[in-house]
């Protein structure tokens, strides 16, 4: 019976409380069901027909464009003062090393890519 209630609770997106270990009987369990806040807020947030929600303006892209050539300015890097091409740039401002750069030659560990911070690279024309 408890497994049926828990499976229904999972399907409906509800939370349950696991059995309390302070009960004297090891088989006694208690099921507490609380409705999720997101499920209750979803119908209220529905917009009237005919109105499309306005999209938030995108911030300008961070870092160099994909495929552009960059010079490495990190002194301890194997590719210091070398030129590589940008593979990807993480647009999250909290990322420490958002720019992935690929090089033609490999380092001692046979790796040809590395991540760099925005102040450790310089775009080459």
Curated annotation (Swiss-Prot):
InterPro entries: Elect_transpt_acc-like_dom_sf (IPR008990), PSI_PsaE (IPR003375). Pfam families: PSI_PsaE. Residues 1-34 form a transit peptide. It is a peripheral membrane protein. Keywords: Chloroplast, Membrane, Photosynthesis, Photosystem I, Plastid, Thylakoid, Transit peptide. GO terms for cellular component: chloroplast thylakoid membrane; photosystem I reaction center. Residues 42-57 have a biased composition (Low complexity). Residues 42-68 are annotated as: Disordered. Belongs to the PsaE family. This is Photosystem I reaction center subunit IV, chloroplastic. It comes from Spinacia oleracea.
